[in-house]
A protein has these predicted regions:
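Canonical Rossmann dinucleotide-binding motif of NAD(H)/NADP(H)-dependent dehydrogenases/reductases
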Residues: 2-33
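Conserved mid-core segment of classical short-chain dehydrogenase/reductases
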Residues: 94-118, 141, 161-164, 253
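Catalytic Tyr-X3-Lys loop
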Residues: 106-129, 144, 148, 172-173, ...
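A short, exposed helix-loop element centered on a Lys and neighboring polar residues
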Residues: 132-133, 178
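Alpha-helical segment proximal to the catalytic Tyr-Lys
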Residues: 137, 181-183, 234
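Residue(s) in the substrate-gating loop at a strand-loop-helix junction
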Residues: 152
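Short C-terminal tail/terminal secondary-structure segment
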Residues: 157, 237-254
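Short, small/polar-rich loop/turn modules that mediate ligand/substrate recognition or access, typified
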Residues: 185-190, 236-238
Length: 254
């Protein structure tokens, strides 16, 4: 696969799968606009990518829940590279974990302060919604593009304490992705959701069961995203693709 001259925006790109995608995309010749709220880590990652890859990376500080900042990322991408070919919404996380909520003090869903869940909905659902709204203006103009949402097995399974995460991911997987694919079709814009099961971005994921008997490697998820974005993946549109080692098929065997 090659992405020479292609332009991607990746949120949550200072670490995890967002960073891994950015590294892969640049290594394959693509230019990438990396967004994150962690400025120091982001700029270091950008510098490392630019030191050893064909493609160019730029870093833009962005809170995905702030629409004005989202539009600024879009504008910077167009100013720097002239177009936006791919938009990948990596930024997200379970609010209770990301906000370091003490579950001994707040043990159940109704006990957790609502502002914690507001953060989760803002980042996990409104963020991708905002980026789609902003980037589609450019993609419509250029009559091409791809939006990739990152869902989760949690969107299909539910989560008693992480309801913000499960609700948001389900919204991406089944509502936003299909709606964007329907809207984008006349403009040659696709939308696909990639929904991982347990992936070894955190040690805790190793204990989750799958039919293949292991958690996924981050590179396996990124490889699927790259395939969808490549010339070989052009017939994939409007779908939520589970990449979960068969976890969603386990049913009562979990």
């Amino acid at each position: 696969m090659e992405f020479n001259g292609k332009v991607a925006i990746a949120t949550g790109a200072a670490s995890g799968m967002g960073l891994l995608f950015s590294q892969n995309f640049a290594a394959l010749g693509g230019n990438v606009v990396m967004c994150d709220v962690s400025e120091e880590v982001l700029l270091k990652s950008v510098e490392e990518i630019n030191a050893k890859n064909q493609g160019k990376a730029i870093g833009v500080l962005c809170d995905v829940s702030d629409y004005n900042q989202v539009c600024a990322v879009r504008d910077r991408a167009v100013e720097e590279f002239g177009r936006i070919d791919i938009m990948v919404n990596f930024a997200g996380g379970t609010a209770v974990r990301m906000r370091q909520v003490d579950t001994n003090i707040y043990p159940e869903f109704p006990d957790v302060p609502i502002d914690v869940y507001d953060w989760g909905i803002d980042v996990n659902l409104k963020g991708p919604f905002y980026f789609a709204h902003a980037c589609l203006k450019q993609m419509r103009k250029q009559n091409s593009g791809l939006i990739i949402n990152i869902g989760s097995i949690t969107g299909a399974e539910g989560a008693t304490l992480g309801m913000d995460y499960a609700t948001s991911k389900a919204g991406l997987m089944y509502g936003l992705t299909k709606s964007l694919a329907q809207y984008g079709a006349p403009y040659n814009v696709r939308c696909v959701c990639v929904s991982p099961g347990p992936v070894l971005t955190r040690a805790a994921m190793a204990t989750m069961k799958t039919l293949v008997g292991r958690a996924g490697e981050p590179q396996e998820i990124v490889d699927l995203i790259l395939f969808i974005a490549s010339s070989k993946g052009q017939f994939i549109n409007g779908e939520n693709i589970m990449i979960d080692g068969g976890r969603n098929a386990m049913g009562r065997w979990k």
